[in-house]
Amino acid sequence: MIKSELVQKIAEANPHLYQRDVENIVNAILEQVASALERGDRVELRGFGAFSVKKRDARVGRNPRTGKQVDVSEKTVPYFKTGKEMRERLNTGK
């Protein structure tokens, strides 16, 4: 599912809301999550999961085309851990 499909599904489930307003709300939520992650904060949506950032150490990699060693610098990457309720829902098929 892509963002526009998510907006459409939410708008269909809430006919009292305009699709444009739903899109603005979804964008605002995503912006707040991104801003929190930028600051290094953890974002927990209880029952769904938690977004956080992790540091990935610098390492020596390999160029798959040439086989040459390449230095890969340290970087910060987003991380998502599913919540208990979401894992249970996925495993029971509900």
From Swiss-Prot:
It comes from the Bacteria. InterPro entries: Hist_DNA-bd, Histone-like_DNA-bd_CS, IHF-like_DNA-bd_dom_sf, IHF_beta. GO terms for cellular component: chromosome; cytosol. The keyword DNA-binding applies. PROSITE patterns: HISTONE_LIKE. Pfam families: Bac_DNA_binding (PF00216). GO terms for biological process: DNA recombination; regulation of DNA-templated transcription; regulation of translation. CDD domains: IHF_B. GO terms for molecular function: DNA binding; structural constituent of chromatin. The keyword Transcription applies. Keywords: DNA recombination, DNA-binding, Transcription, Transcription regulation, Translation regulation. Heterodimer of an alpha and a beta chain. Belongs to the bacterial histone-like protein family. This protein is one of the two subunits of integration host factor, a specific DNA-binding protein that functions in genetic recombination as well as in transcriptional and translational control. This is Integration host factor subunit beta. The lineage of its organism: Bacteria, Pseudomonadati, Pseudomonadota, Alphaproteobacteria, Hyphomicrobiales.
